[in-house]
Amino acid sequence: SHVKNIISAFVRYAVDEDYISKDFTRNAKTYAAKESKRSDLKFLENDELEKLIQSVKESDATTSHMILIAIYSGARYAEIAGLTKDDFDFENNTININKSWQANDQEFKATKTKTSNRVIDMPHDIMELAKSWTFGERYAFESTTGLPPTNNAVNKQLRRYLEKNDSKIITFHGLRHTHASYLLSKDIAIQYVSERLGHADVNITLSVYTHLLDKKRSIETQKALDELQKL
């Protein structure tokens, strides 16, 4: 229905902005949409992530390149699909997020929020690998249609890798959560992670990754008590 389409559009926006973790309208019937829960948030564990990276690096498929960029940048699908070759700065090892690809309209549009426009620092070896990729003239990542691969296409490719590696199944958007979860698990400051993700507010990051932060808090509490005990 028209109303469901409007609701779905808002939900997709909320997922992109990480206000919620899952598009609960995707397979929902009109009369019974389920609410999203934080427990639906899925991300790869470190061993699963390492296996995925190894598999992706061995492929020259455009969808594989997009997966690799998602892993190391934490960018959204629309942001990665919206990249052009000029957005890759190989001298400074950065990618410039300044627009997004809108598949329905088949055109570039502004990013979701002002803070979504950002320059993301990338690992040197990943940018060296990207130098060998063949970028399209209009889009960095072009499929045989001359347009960026669809969200469905990159999700299918990702699923093939995960199934082959016997890893948990996540979506392409789940790579964004994996990126953030990995950095937070390595004690990277949440303010920096929030900026890297392009969140409008650090509170969004705090709310999305509360499960990880609660776990880290218990560890930090014990460390603090151990230090205080030495006084």
Model-derived regions: residue spans:
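Proline-centered turn/helix-capping motifs that create local helix->coil transitions or kinks
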Residues: 15-25, 90-93, 130-133, 137
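Basic, Lys/Arg- and aromatic-enriched nucleic-acid-binding interface segment
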Residues: 1, 5, 16, 20-77, ...
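Catalytic-site neighborhood detector that most strongly recognizes the C-terminal catalytic loop/helix
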Residues: 101, 127, 197-223
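Short, basic (Lys/Arg/His-rich) helix/loop patches that form interaction surfaces
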Residues: 54-64, 73, 120, 135-139, ...
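Conserved tyrosine-mediated DNA breakage-rejoining catalytic core shared by Y-recombinases
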Residues: 29-30, 82-132
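N-terminal core-binding DNA-recognition domain of tyrosine site-specific recombinases/integrases
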Residues: 1-19, 23, 38, 147-153, ...
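Short, polar N-cap/turn motifs at the start of nucleic acid-interacting alpha helices
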Residues: 87-94, 188-210
